[in-house]
């Protein structure tokens, strides 16, 4: 069936659907089997039904003008070409002047409503993350998008993400108040609501439109302690007090790319709307310790004082996309610092504070064995401490190589690799930190061996190379969604660093080894199908105590 094949060439695979829906790419990770669509429809209906039972209004994807990049050739449509995203061809944008805009958007909403009913909110993000708007009348485009949505539900609200230039000001400035709700996506770091101190400040904020104060916090689902506690609290109360922004502020939101990390920060952002007056991080953390562990304990209070004053309190002016990344997960290099291309991470805390927090947690670990929240945090804090140690050791390796000191190089590189294996062992005690949990979830979505293999490949690629060679290397996407997890540490990150150290050892021996092709090494793992268990191994407290004693 020609049409089905063409549709499948357009829709992205399960690991990359989010980027397809944001107009960043098409087709990558697919083609999907028919059972995938059936399964997703069934799941979506369950989610929407349950949301409505709870009185939650779902935000469904609205029509943003997206059509396949070859829609001009295939369908004769009048389109604008938004260009490329990290080497992927973006879908084209259907010009509002094309008479078929109305027809296609109406068809889209008709089918959507047939499946999931009408809603009061539709998510629409044209030209997300740098798409070219050349040749597009933005005012007309905004009005056409709004008109199409309103035909489906006259009371519906367009929901847009404020990220970089999206939504473009000319597209929204003439829309009626109340028709648009903007998610200020990165409020704790790069707010656009009108804060003059922000590098992404929009003069006049969002004008007449309502907006939501959102914490982004996590990029790529990366693992690592991180937060901007003071900036998050202060930013919210500053916005509330602002003459203009305070009038149009509608609430708070969470917009992370990956969840199941840094639970303390989600607790904190959700506290904001309930507290009329500004409060301090210190006073809030006192209550948090009891809420988190069900006990009052001086050592645990000290842990959170150290973390709250340090790694969880990145200053507002330190622009950083997510966590302080673990060097274990980096594509190797002598002066490697950040793992993903756009992390922009900065030194803003004392690593010794993290190690001291880990020591305190280990000191009371016997007392709280079996306390689930404590054991999760014990692993997470000790994981961060090991990553700090790894960063120091990697610098020793580099210094020894540059000094031509073979003995120190050999010792330091072996110690670094051993730290990766200890990290792997520690994380294996919790299912949340196991690559097996991730792969098992992906495989379980498939009905046949072929489907399971496709979904596993999507899952493996997303957390390693992310794309093909061009997207990974020139596009910068490799390691974007890296995971400091059990299984992948041992088999992927260890392998990569060992290959690099072997290469450097040859150089120290005066040989001229062939340059390493990292992508080839990485791609091999994405094609493997070796089993990873999701079942925790070892006693968390015993393993954590032993590792701490050995390393620190």
Predicted feature descriptions by range:
Residues 1-25, 29-308, 313-315, 320-324, ...:
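Catalytic-core regions of glycoside hydrolase
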Residues 28, 374, 394:
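Acidic/histidine-rich, surface-exposed loop or edge segments in extracytoplasmic proteins
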Residues 347-361, 365, 380-402:
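C-terminal substrate/ligand-recognition segments
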Residues 364-378, 426-441:
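Short, solvent-exposed, charged loop/turn and helix-capping segments
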Residues 373-387, 391, 415, 441:
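Extended non-globular C-terminal regions
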Residues 382, 424-425:
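Substrate-recognition/cap regions that form aromatic- and gly/pro-loop-enriched pockets
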Residues 485-552:
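Extended, compositionally biased alpha-helical segments that mediate assembly or anchoring
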């Amino acid at each position: 069936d020609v049409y089905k094949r063409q549709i499948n060439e357009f829709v992205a695979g399960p690991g990359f659907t989010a980027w397809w829906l944001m107009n960043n790419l098409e087709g990558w990770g697919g083609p999907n089997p028919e059972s995938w669509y059936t399964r997703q429809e069934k799941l979506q209906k369950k989610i929407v039904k349950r949301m409505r039972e709870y009185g939650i209004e779902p935000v469904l994807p609205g029509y943003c003008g997206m059509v396949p990049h070859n829609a001009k050739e295939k369908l004769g449509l009048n389109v604008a070409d938004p260009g490329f995203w990290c080497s992927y061809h973006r879908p084209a944008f259907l010009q509002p002047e094309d008479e078929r805009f109305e027809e296609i958007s109406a068809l889209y909403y008709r089918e959507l409503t047939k499946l999931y009913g009408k809603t009061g909110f539709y998510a629409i993000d044209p030209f997300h993350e740098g798409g070219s708007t050349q040749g597009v009348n933005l005012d007309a485009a905004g009005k056409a998008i709004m008109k199409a949505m309103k035909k489906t539900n006259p009371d519906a609200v367009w929901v847009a993400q404020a990220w970089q230039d999206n939504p473009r000001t000319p597209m929204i400035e003439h829309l009626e108040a109340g028709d648009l709700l903007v998610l200020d996506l990165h409020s704790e770091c790069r707010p656009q609501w009108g804060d003059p101190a922000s590098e992404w400040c929009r003069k006049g904020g969002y004008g007449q439109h309502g907006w939501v104060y959102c914490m982004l916090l996590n990029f790529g689902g990366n693992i690592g302690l991180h937060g901007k506690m003071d900036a998050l609290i202060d930013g919210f109360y500053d916005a509330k007090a602002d003459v203009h922004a305070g009038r149009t502020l509608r609430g708070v939101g969470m917009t992370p790319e990956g969840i199941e990390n840094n639970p303390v920060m989600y607790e904190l952002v959700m506290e904001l709307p309930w507290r009329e007056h500004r409060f301090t991080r210190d006073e809030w953390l006192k209550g948090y310790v009891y809420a988190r562990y069900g006990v009052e304990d001086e050592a645990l209070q000290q842990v959170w004082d150290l973390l709250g004053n340090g790694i969880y309190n990145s200053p507002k002016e330190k622009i950083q996309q997510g966590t302080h990344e673990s060097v274990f997960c980096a594509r190797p290099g002598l002066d490697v610092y950040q793992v993903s291309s756009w992390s922009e991470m900065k030194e803003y805390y004392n690593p010794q504070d993290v190690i001291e927090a880990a020591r305190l947690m280990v000191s009371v670990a016997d007392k709280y064995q079996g306390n689930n929240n404590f054991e999760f945090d014990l692993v997470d804090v000790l994981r961060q401490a090991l990553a700090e140690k790894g960063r120091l050791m990697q610098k020793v390796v580099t210094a020894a190589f540059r000094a031509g000191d073979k003995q120190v190089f050999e010792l330091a590189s072996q110690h670094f690799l051993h730290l990766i294996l200890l990290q792997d062992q520690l994380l294996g005690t919790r299912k949340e930190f196991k690559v097996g949990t991730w792969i098992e979830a992906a495989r379980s979505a498939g009905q046949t061996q072929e489907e399971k293999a496709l979904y596993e490949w999507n899952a493996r690629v997303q957390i390693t190379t992310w794309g093909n060679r061009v997207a990974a290397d020139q596009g910068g996407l490799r390691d974007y969604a890296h995971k400091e997890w059990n299984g992948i540490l041992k088999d992927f990150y260890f392998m990569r660093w060992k290959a690099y150290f072997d290469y450097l050892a040859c150089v120290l021996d005066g040989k001229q080894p062939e340059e390493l092709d990292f992508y080839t090494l990485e791609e091999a793992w994405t094609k493997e199908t070796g089993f990873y268990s999701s079942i925790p191994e070892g006693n968390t407290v015993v393993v954590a105590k032993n590792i701490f004693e050995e390393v620190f």
